[in-house]
């Protein structure tokens, strides 16, 4: 089975990671509606090969949030910190808005009480107006900020630059959404190696430590996240192949089908609770006031509802408490798990729909399924688990994967495989498919509306990546539309099946040029399409194919052959006619021409004769994308402008972080120094007047810090800190030397004592060492001792608050210099013993004796032969 697939070889075992000479790392990003998780594949020594990166709060997942407050941009945890106070300034669920039309997004944010100020941009997509009232960001720009944030988390984790990533996407993401994420990555300055469907990441993680050589299996991955639910059917198996002369088993999996429910998720359950508690609070408040109309109140309520739902997963009842929910009124209540399940009654049966659909369309029964693996945070709800368990008829659900991290870890393996800097050993074949089928349709002045110009291009679940080719009989310029195959299965918010449009030109010119020639076949347009590993379909190029047949003069051959002059296959030859020569010259730059003639043996020429030759010209056509709508790509100008905006924000963020760091350093220095100045150690090495003046300076800067310096820039903080250090550093240095200097003195004296023994050992056991070298070492040691004795005596006469006569650093420097000289002398090798050379006379005598012995032996042999 494995032979029929195109293979993506993927890491299965962490110990199979093989480093290349240079350090390299890649990351995966699980971009959810509410959370973003980051995993890093890093071959750096001392670090786990694959690990989840923690954020600034040491958490393994970060809020997928962007906020703007007082001119500053906040990301992740920082943005989450102001959600309750400024809900209109914190932008969430951005993944669910990318590539969507304005009306769809407007309806969505209203349904979940998100108080965003949105506008419709020129593409019909959403622009989000931030709190300054004038700046508008596209969803792609805001997603770029989150991807940049994820990249920074990875770099902080890996301690090296990380720009190559794989981003997981839900299977129902259409072309507009996938293109939008790719554009966001371009704006973020990161390189997306591929988008990967979430179920493929989970399936890869599932297959890491399993062997399917003894039996294949079907596994369903059931994922309920915040905003959607899907079920993916995956078939695991193994095949055998030869590797280095041995038969090895290779595991593989193929995604057979995936079905989803776009409006069902953990958020659906939370909104039932929100509505329930909003009604309850309205009754308490009275006067016809509806808390739903107040964004800040709803933000507080939604935040607490999340906690209440989590408590209900482990307890049969849960409290909810919101201080100052609205109009200075606190809200407190409780809810039982039974009541919660009743509020969500219709959701439980609905949760089975993806499971039922995937079984129905695959023709399998639940008994054919080896496991139903649950992933996604919402699958922790007990009622959901019991509903699924009852449907599949098993005593226990399959929970072998980490519900939160399976996708990001599996995607990290995918990223490692795609990276040029990481080599993998163990293999797992992956065949994922397109969740949508696609059509291609041609339009133009002479394009007939029939099956020949509107046809299936990509069937549903076509493997990723793939190349497609279609040929059309046309002689005029035309337009190409790419559309979803079924209007019954469309991405969320899609109003038209058509998602991409192209104009193809150059065909009319080519047709006009060659129409007067003897065409042997109708002019055709060949179109080349690709379905990328990210699941994005595009028209890559087009060619005009023109075939002509012409009579030409060719040399006669003195042979008897079939006089039939019909076309046959052969290699290209030059034409003799002037007309054909001109055509060849004209088309040389823009076309590929091939000639076909009959193959004949080489014989003597008897003049010329007429023969037919077939020539094929392939002329590149101009393909220009003209897609409109929310999924339209940014123009070059828009892309450049967006990059400038984001770079300015990045620069401002760096300056803000630097300012905050320097402000914190200044504040910490003031508090730490004041505390030190009151210690006995500092009293020893400073005068009372010196300490008093320094404390006054510290107080002065501290007052400035909390008043005029509250909004100062980084340069101001750095300048103030340097001015304090100029006073404090000499005092701190004297304090440090008070401890360090005696240690250095003791070290030096101990070494000088040891050196005397070393010199004695040299004189006794290493007699080959030159005496002058030993004397040099002895003299240098004496110099060090004299310098040390003199300065120690001088230091004892000097007050501790004065500048030290000498420092510990100077002591170590002199000892280390002496040690280097000792090492060099100690390494002088012992001379090799002299070997006495054999004199020439002795050699000659030996040779003569050997020669004489040989002659006598030869004579003795001769005498035996005679006998």
Curated annotation (Swiss-Prot):
User: Which branch of life, at top level?
Assistant: Eukaryota
Localization per Swiss-Prot or TrEMBL: Endoplasmic reticulum lumen
Could you tell me where the Polar residues compositional bias lies? 560-575, 587-598
Annotated Gene Ontology MF terms?
Answer: ATP binding; ATP-dependent protein folding chaperone
> Which stretch carries the motif Prevents secretion from ER?
865-867
**Cellular component, GO, one term:** endoplasmic reticulum
Keywords assigned by UniProt, alphabetized? ATP-binding, Chaperone, Endoplasmic reticulum, Nucleotide-binding, Signal
Mind telling me which Gene3D superfamilies this protein's record contains? 1.20.1270.10, 3.30.30.30, 3.30.420.40, Actin, Chain A, domain 4 (3.90.640.10), Substrate Binding Domain Of DNAk, Chain A, domain 1 (2.60.34.10)
Main location group: endoplasmic reticulum
Stretch forming the signal peptide: 1-24
- Annotated region Disordered: the residues are 560-607, 829-867
Q: Where is the composition biased (Basic and acidic residues)?
A: 833-867
Q: Which family does it belong to?
A: Belongs to the heat shock protein 70 (TC 1.A.33) family. HSP110/SSE subfamily.
Q: What is this protein called?
A: Heat shock 70 kDa protein 17
In the UniProt record, the gene name given for this protein reads HSP70-17
């Amino acid at each position: 089975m494995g032979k029929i697939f195109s293979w993506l070889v993927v890491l299965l075992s962490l110990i199979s990671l093989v480093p290349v000479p240079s350090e390299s790392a890649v990351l995966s990003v699980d971009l959810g509606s509410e959370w973003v998780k980051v995993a890093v594949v890093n071959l750096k020594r001392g670090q786990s090969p694959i690990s989840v990166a923690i954020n600034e709060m040491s958490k393994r997942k970060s809020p997928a949030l962007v906020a703007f407050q007082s001119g500053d941009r906040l990301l992740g945890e920082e943005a989450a910190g102001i959600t309750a106070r400024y809900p209109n300034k914190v932008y969430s669920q951005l993944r669910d808005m990318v590539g969507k039309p304005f009306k769809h997004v407007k309806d969505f944010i209203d349904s979940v009480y998100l108080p965003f100020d949105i506008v419709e941009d020129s593409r019909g997509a959403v622009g989000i107006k931030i709190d300054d009232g004038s700046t508008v960001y596209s969803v792609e720009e805001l997603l770029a900020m989150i991807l940049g944030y994820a990249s920074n988390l990875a770099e902080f984790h890996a301690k090296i630059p990380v720009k190559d990533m794989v981003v997981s996407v839900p299977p129902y993401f259409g072309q507009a959404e996938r293109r939008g994420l790719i554009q966001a990555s371009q704006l973020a300055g990161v390189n997306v190696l591929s988008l990967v469907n979430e179920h493929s990441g989970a399936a890869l993680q599932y297959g890491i430590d399993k062997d399917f050589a003894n039996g294949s299996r079907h596994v369903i991955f059931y994922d309920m996240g915040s905003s959607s639910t899907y079920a993916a059917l995956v078939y695991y198996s193994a095949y055998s192949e030869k590797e280095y002369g041995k038969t090895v088993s290779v595991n593989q999996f193929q995604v057979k089908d995936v079905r989803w429910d776009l409006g069902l998720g953990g958020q659906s359950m939370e909104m039932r609770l929100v509505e329930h508690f909003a009604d309850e609070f309205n009754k308490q408040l009275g006067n016809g006031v509806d808390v739903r109309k107040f964004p800040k109140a709803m933000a507080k309520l939604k935040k607490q509802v999340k906690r209440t739902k989590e408590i209900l997963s482990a307890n049969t009842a849960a409290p909810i408490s919101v201080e100052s929910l609205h109009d200075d009124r606190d809200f407190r209540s409780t809810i039982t798990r039974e009541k919660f399940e009743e509020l969500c009654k219709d959701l439980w049966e609905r949760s089975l729909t993806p499971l039922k659909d995937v079984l129905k369309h695959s023709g399998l029964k639940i008994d054919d399924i080896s496991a139903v693996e649950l992933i996604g945070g919402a699958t922790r709800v007990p009622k959901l688990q019991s509903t699924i368990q009852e449907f599949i008829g098993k005593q226990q659900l399959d929970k072998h994967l980490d519900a939160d991290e399976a996708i990001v870890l599996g995607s990290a393996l995918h990223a490692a495989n795609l990276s040029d800097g990481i080599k993998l050993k163990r293999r797992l074949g992956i065949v994922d498919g397109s969740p949508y089928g696609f059509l291609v349709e041609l339009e133009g002045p002479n394009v007939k509306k029939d099956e020949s110009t509107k046809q299936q291009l990509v069937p549903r679940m076509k493997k990723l990546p793939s190349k497609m080719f279609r040929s059309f009989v046309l002689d005029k310029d035309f337009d190409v539309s790419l559309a979803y195959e079924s209007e019954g299965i469309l991405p969320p918010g899609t109003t038209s099946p058509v998602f991409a449009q192209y104009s193809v030109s150059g065909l009319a010119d080519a047709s006009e040029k060659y129409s007067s020639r003897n065409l042997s076949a109708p002019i055709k347009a060949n179109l080349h399409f690709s379905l990328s590993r990210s699941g994005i379909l595009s028209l890559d190029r087009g060619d005009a194919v023109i075939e002509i047949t012409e009579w030409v003069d060719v040399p006669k051959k003195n042979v008897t052959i079939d006089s039939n002059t019909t076309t046959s296959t052969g290699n290209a030859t030059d034409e003799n006619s002037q007309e054909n020569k001109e055509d060849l010259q004209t088309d040389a730059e823009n076309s590929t021409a091939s000639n076909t003639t009959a193959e004949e043996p080489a014989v003597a020429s008897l003049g010329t004769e007429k023969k037919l030759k077939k020539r094929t010209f392939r002329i590149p056509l101009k393909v220009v994308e003209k897609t409109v709508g929310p999924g339209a790509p940014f123009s070059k100008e828009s892309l450049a402008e967006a990059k400038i905006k984001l770079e300015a924000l990045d620069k401002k963020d760096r300056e803000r972080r630097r300012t905050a760091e320097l402000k914190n350093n200044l504040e910490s220095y003031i508090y730490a120094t004041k505390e030190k100045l009151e210690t006995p150690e500092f009293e020893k090495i400073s005068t009372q007047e010196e300490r008093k003046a320094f404390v006054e300076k510290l107080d002065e800067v501290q007052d400035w810090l909390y008043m005029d310096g509250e909004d100062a820039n980084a340069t101001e903080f750095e300048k103030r800190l340097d001015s304090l250090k100029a006073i404090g550093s000499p005092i701190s240095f004297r304090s440090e030397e008070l401890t360090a200097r005696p240690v250095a003195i003791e070290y030096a004296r101990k070494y000088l004592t040891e050196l005397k023994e070393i010199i004695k050992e040299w004189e006794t056991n290493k007699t080959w060492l030159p005496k002058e070298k030993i004397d040099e070492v002895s003299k240098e040691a004496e110099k060090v001792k004299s310098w040390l004795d003199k300065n120690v005596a001088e230091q004892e006469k000097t007050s501790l608050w004065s500048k030290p006569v000498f420092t510990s650093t100077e002591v170590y420097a002199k000892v280390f210099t002496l040690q280097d000289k000792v090492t060099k002398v100690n390494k002088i090798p012992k001379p090799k013993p002299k070997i006495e050379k054999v004199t020439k006379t002795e050699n000659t005598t030996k040779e003569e004796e050997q020669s004489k012995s040989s002659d006598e032996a030869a004579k003795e042999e001769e005498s035996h032969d005679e006998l």
